[in-house]
Amino acid sequence: MDDQQPLQTYNQPPPPLPKHIQLQIQQRQLQLQQQEEQERLQQQQQQQQQQQDQQQHKLEEGSRRRSLSDVVGGVNISNKETPKRAFRIYWANDNHMYWTLLLDSTNTVGDVSEGLKDKVPSSGTQCYLYKRTKANFGRWKDRRLSNEDSVWDIVDRRRKNHKSDPIFVLKRKKSTFSISQKKSPQNESDTSPLSSSGEFLNPYTNPTGSNNIVPSNAGHSRNTSSNSNNSANTSSNNLLAHHQFNNNNNNNNNNNNNNNNNNNNNNNNNNNNNNNNNNNNNNNSNNSSNSNSNNSSNTTTTTTTTTTTTTTSTSTNSINTSNNNNNNNSGSNINPSSFISPMSSLVSLSLSSSPASSAPHSPTLSSQPSSPHTITPITTSPPPPQRNNSSKSLKSTMEMEPPAEYISLLSNNPPPTNGSGSRPPSGSFIPGSIVNGSRSSASDLIGFKPPVCQQQQQQQQQQQQQQQQQVQQQQQQPQQVQQLQQLQQLQQQYQQQQPQQQIQPLSPQQQSQQQQQSPVKQSESIPQSPNLQSITQSSSSNKPLSGSTGMNRSSSPSPFAKKNIGGGGGGGSLADRKNRLSVQPKDIMRLMRFYFGDSLDGTFFTIAVQNDTSAKDVCASVEQKLLLPSGSTFVSLVLPIQPNGSKIERVLGEDEIIIEVKDTWEDPSQTFFQVTHKQQAPNNKRLSRQIQAEPHVIPSEWRRSTDAISLRASSDDMWKRKSIPIFLQVTGPPNTHSHSHSPQRQLPNMSGSPHSHHHHQNNNNNNNNNNNNNNNNDLDDDDSDDESDFDVSTLRGWVHWIPSADLEYIKRIGSGTYSKVYKGKYRDKFVAIKTMRGSNMTTEQIESFKKECDILSTIQSPLLISFYGSCIEESQLSMVVEYCSKGTLHKVLNNPLLDFDWDKWFKWMTEVVEGVRYLHSMNPPMVHRDLKTLNILISSDWTAKLCDFGLTRTMTMTNVSTLGMLRGTMAYTAPEIYDGLLFNTKSDVYSLGVIMWEAIQRCISGVYLRPFHEHPISMDIQIIILTSKNKVRPKISENCPEQLKTLITRCWDENPDKRPNCDEILEILLTMKQAHDENKDEWESIRTKLPKQTIKAVSSSSSNNNNNNNNNNNNNNNNNNNNNNNNNNNNGTNTNSTVNNVVVPSSSNATIVVAPSVSSNSSNINTSMDNKSMSSLSDSPVLPSVGIVSTSSLTGNSNINNNNNNIHDNNNPNNNNSNNSNNTSLDVPPVGVILTRDRRNSIIAVGEVPVIVKPPETPDGTTMVTEVFDFEVPQDSPSLEPLSSNNIISTANILNIGYVNNENNSIIIEGNKSTLNEIGNNNNNNNNNNNNNNNNNNSSNNNSINNNSSNNDENNCINNCINIESNESCIKSNTPEQITLKCVDER
């Protein structure tokens, strides 16, 4: 074994692990990593949850009332890393002044008002913070915020409810009225820091008797005077930086002992059994000038605060002090706005008293009394109010109990206490005050004390000694019994002084009734004794305090605070409620607000309306209040919401009852009454002409104030102006027009066809242009002597400006309340020109005009109307946009001849949705806000395009105010807008649902029905009430496919979040379009097919014109320069003429056109007509060019003159000798009809039997009857229904009877050439006679055309039949009739 060597070990690498084991190891490692990651995420979530809990805890603490412990030295001791948010606080007196504050979650409204108190223009003024939100009808609503509210919570709550952020507004406390406006010079130094804001200062003394001791320290200065006769007003203006304690300038807390010995003993130091006798005999007669007569409403916040009373109870030493200050403060409650000097006779005898002691906010009492007129500044905030559970009399601010009900017993004129359930003392309920509306004298308002004689002083001293003997007994009795005994003693004393007056003790109920029924009489008949008055005053000021800082608010009722039904402190018994309500007469039914003038933010009157109060009574009250002449006002009921932004008002009759008128409306809260002063007629109606002659003389009544706002060169500043001055001349860039612009120059006539802006090269049309201008002058209704235009030439610096010389106005195609729409030309392209005149424009309309131009200039889509620019002229703004000849979708749907099938429905709805999707896809999204069928135009190629972007707004914070306004037609407006929410993209989806419903209803039933047609609606506002409150929607047809019905229902869902967006709608429409293409028969089966209608005849109106138009036509190629053509010389006989052997009734202004064949010289046809005839037909919706309907095989040639537009028949040899040099001979194999766009001219079909003018066909084979009509927006568009006076003449009637009835305004020409020749020969055998004078026959209605005529007449009806513009000289009648198409049912 020894020879064996040990085994040698070699460091060899371990063998590799199998692959499956390696995979398991890797998986395990991954699992461990995932577990670690999950643990780390859980820790992070826990930390975040803890942070959220801490943040929520801070928010909850911030929502509660903040105490003074949260603030040390005025500096917030919270965490510096607390997130802060920026808030903008606006100053209500100046819209351009605001402060931006960084606030955290703990900051409250009280912090904001305190922080901005010294930063307002009038530093030191009491201010309140208000929340301004959007109310109904676009009005603002302000609500005063409580000091405890957290600013973060206010904003977050509104955001959580999907509402807009409020606007925080800081307002100055409104000042109050006073009797005297003079100030006493000796009291100016005693002015309270809060008195300038109109704070009601409390005239009453210590609220809870002697239980509450107000000590003075650095924060509270109580002025005491020992062993002195201070007849002056002792000042103790105690101003707390955080509590804002307001003491009167003449402190009523001076403890007076005027020989009455009315001791209110405070047993505060119970530990040492020492009674701190504070003889607070506040002998304040309350001789104030605050419009208070024994019943003042001013509340002294210092005397009602008990937050510092704990200092006397925490003292370890027993201190017995008796404060007997003989300060007869006869004017102790004088408001600094009006002082009354105390009378010399009011000074009472001085009595000795112990040194006054004050109790500071510390365990030890201050031994240094303050001087009488010292106001100690506050450098640090006082400690928070403390609670002492050992003493019931020491309670915090929020724990004060209401006073006893019978604390004001035996008082002649006591103010109603809170315990009795009556209204707290208020300035609006002061008997005899101005606010109360009484006409009492000054003596009724200010109750002076009677003079104090020596005998009375001796009696007072005797009574004082008797009272001192009863001190020990009174200390053992309850507080209320002591006060009752004191009042009884005072009553006996007062009866001894005035034995002739017998005062009976009154119960609290009787006292309250007596005061409510005759408060002024009591003050006149029985003057109160000083001590009695002081105690009643102290009891009347006893009410709970509110607010986070313990500040006593004004006793005037706040319009933002809710009324306490149960009274100030307790609920009150049934008898108390009856007593409280007995002040209102039984015949008063309701309080209603009547606004005066047009502005809702101005003056209004709240009137107690009775059952029989009429509008005449209201007018009389307002006239008497405002000193207006009798009968110069009227009352109207106003509905403020309308689609065009205007308001609807109904003037009430004098005998109409106000309550009945208010209750007749379904929702009375949506209406309000308005009292309007009747405007007198202007004295000088020719004022505008005077200003044009003497522009430097501007009467004061025509001046519009600019308030020193200077005009700047920048055009953007011009849009920001609140008002545009009328007569302010500002030079702008020079215009390219041939003549210069001036503010006084009136614009040319824009209503008809202002051809002064463009010139024709053809001289043959000069006279026609003048005739058109003269005939269309009646369309312009804007010219008046009183029109005052303002200068907008400074707006020409705008980027979209188009010179007026580049625009050509053709005719007016529409008009509205504030604008007119013309058809015109711009750069050889037909455009629509929307104009706004200065006399109708307001600042909002100008801003809307600019907004629409800005939006149109930024969008580029074939599904939206194209924008070319804007034209700025004197007193006129024009917008140049794309011209759509077919008109609006609303008009197309109302056309009964249109075959509105599913193909059109899918095509137009898809295009509309794509256009809306384009707006919504912009960044930021753009909301149209006024989607309806009237704002969807159909172009000449039958494409739907959106228009009217005046109400369109971007969804940004700058447009929050306008997005909340109720705009658009009510039937298309989403119901949530009525409820105060903002417009968003889902609001447009709601409008799309209504538009699809209209189109489906028209497609299925064949008849257009307006939304909500089944409801009797007299005003548009009722629609929005139906949709929002009653959840009513238009009724969908039963035959509607289920997919479309579901889509429409989703679009107008009540919840905006459940509505689909435009992408979803478009996807659904494309899916349904595929289903329709696959099964058209099934879709067409649900449609109600109307009877097939074909055009059988065309009737024209009979004309009785007696106009002699002498038109001198300049013809360069012919010698017919002086042709006196007397057209339409009708003298009473009816004759018939023939043209090409065709009977033409003379009773109609019919024009027959022999259509030439198409040849290489067809361009001459356009030249032969007016410049604006054939060349303008290219944009006509009637026909692409000249429509020719071949109906016959008649042979013949026709010569068409290039310049004279004469038609010659080659069959007549007498007509081929005058104008052959420049005439082009064309072969005319058929005879046809040229369909014109002018509805006032006739269309006559000539040809074989039967003659039917068929509408043209589209490439897909469908027939569009609407191609025959013009879908512009004319002022007098004819009706599409046939007139009852038009008859249809069949071929049998012509053949059998052999005549044409020419009295029915009907024309039908049927039959072949032979038949027509027979008829023609029977009526006129002299057809081949050469007549050089056209229509020079003594016949009425002789508008027939002889084919032998060689006369050159510019005003011939042949020319006017093919012109775009009709010639008034050819067709003119005193009683014109519309031209209609007669349709016959062929079933």
From Swiss-Prot:
Main location per the UniProt record: membrane
Membrane protein topology class: Lipid-anchor
Keywords, sorted A to Z: ATP-binding, Cell membrane, Kinase, Lipoprotein, Membrane, Nucleotide-binding, Serine/threonine-protein kinase, Transferase
GO cellular component, one term: endocytic vesicle membrane
Span list, region Interaction with adrm1: 668-775
Keyword Membrane among UniProt keywords: yes
Region (Disordered): 1-76, 175-336, 350-447, 501-578, 729-788, 1077-1142, 1158-1181, 1194-1227, 1319-1348
GO molecular function: ATP binding; phosphatidylinositol-4,5-bisphosphate binding; protein kinase activity; protein serine kinase activity; protein serine/threonine kinase activity; small GTPase binding
Ranges of compositional bias, category Polar residues: 1-11, 176-220, 387-396, 518-558, 732-754
Catalysed reaction equations from the record: L-seryl-[protein] + ATP = O-phospho-L-seryl-[protein] + ADP + H(+); L-threonyl-[protein] + ATP = O-phospho-L-threonyl-[protein] + ADP + H(+)
Biased composition (Acidic residues): 778-788
EC code: 2.7.11.1
Residues annotated as domain Protein kinase: 807-1072
Subunit structure of this chain's protein: Interacts with adrm1, rap1, rasG and rasS.
Protein's recorded name: Serine/threonine-protein kinase phg2
UniProt gene name: phg2
